[in-house]
């Protein structure tokens, strides 16, 4: 595949560079890992296969595929076109050779994921193909995609070959073929503007004033333009500590909510540092991380406390849905 237009920020990502944070190496990986995993499953790839993460702000990217290719596109709600024909999201799509795939205006969300059967072929760095642009690590030459870049696609699995073969018989004058069914976005990614995000109390929650603790759950914080894959900087009435707090830097995770001295929270994301020295007021539950990853700058976000038991139940429920999808895919194409 060849990049015709790269868009604002398009990078190669998989689930992330796990196991190396103890050495100070960032995890990176897809912001919305659920959407990438599902895109891969829809076309017979392994869940962690590398795909493209496309930031849907400004003009969208476009790609040329020289060979017949099986793809799936998930994530944000936007218009996908194949050779100027509107094409479906959240389902396997077989495109003809010499086809152009274009990403149009985004209606809701901020990131799309394109997976190709066989996966995007780039060298693995520390067991991951994910791109960390600031460190020039992984992906294609450690950077975002540029116009005229060419990407190779790997060998297809047996399941991918079966899906491609079945859809090939449906190719007609239209530039693509797809099954009638699709995965429900709402089941895996319930997008909503200005979402309410569920959190667990952070280690230093008790060190904030009672007024600030109440405000944290009642205020709608604005996501500022100074937000990126490293973290979302929020703006609202500053949160205050009861007394100055000196901290030793500790490990942080995807979804940690830190409060720097200016009192405006920061949500740490995929390209977060491995440690942080600011008070941690909360941690976003894993079930809501995909929703957070789809928030656009300018939107507002509110926080809602939940129990650890509820957070665990929601995480288990999501993984069960993904397991059911894997089973359904095999039954759909192999029986």
From Swiss-Prot:
In terms of SUPFAM superfamilies, this protein maps to:
Cyclophilin-like
> Which top class of enzyme applies to this chain?
hydrolase
Q: Which reaction does it catalyse?
A: 5-oxo-L-proline + ATP + 2 H2O = L-glutamate + ADP + phosphate + H(+)
Return the SMART domains for the record.
AHS2
Q: What is an example of a GO molecular function annotated in this UniProt entry?
A: ATP binding
The alphabetical list of record keywords is: ATP-binding, Hydrolase, Nucleotide-binding, Sporulation
Instruction: Tell me, according to the record, the phenotype of the null mutant.
Output: Disruption of the gene decreases sporulation. Deletion mutant grows less well than wild type on minimal medium with ammonium as nitrogen source and cannot grow on 5-oxoproline. Mutant lacks 5-oxoprolinase activity and accumulates 5-oxo-L-proline.
Q: What is its EC number?
A: 3.5.2.9
- Signals that turn on the gene: Induced by glucose when readily available sources of nitrogen, such as ammonia or glutamine, are scarce. Transcriptionally activated by TnrA and repressed by KipR.
Q: Which Pfam families match?
A: CT_A_B
Q: Which GO terms describe its biological process?
A: sporulation resulting in formation of a cellular spore
Question: What InterPro entries would the database entry show?
Answer: CT_A_B (IPR003778), Cyclophilin-like_dom_sf (IPR029000), PxpC (IPR052708)
The UniProt similarity line reads: Belongs to the PxpC family.
Q: Fill in the subunit field for this protein.
A: Forms a complex composed of PxpA, PxpB and PxpC. Interacts with PxpB.
**What does the function comment of this entry state?**
Catalyzes the cleavage of 5-oxoproline to form L-glutamate coupled to the hydrolysis of ATP to ADP and inorganic phosphate. In addition, counteracts the inhibitory action of PxpB (KipI) on sporulation, by binding to PxpB and preventing its function as an inhibitor of kinase A.
Q: What is this protein called?
A: 5-oxoprolinase subunit C
Specify the species.
Bacillus subtilis (strain 168)
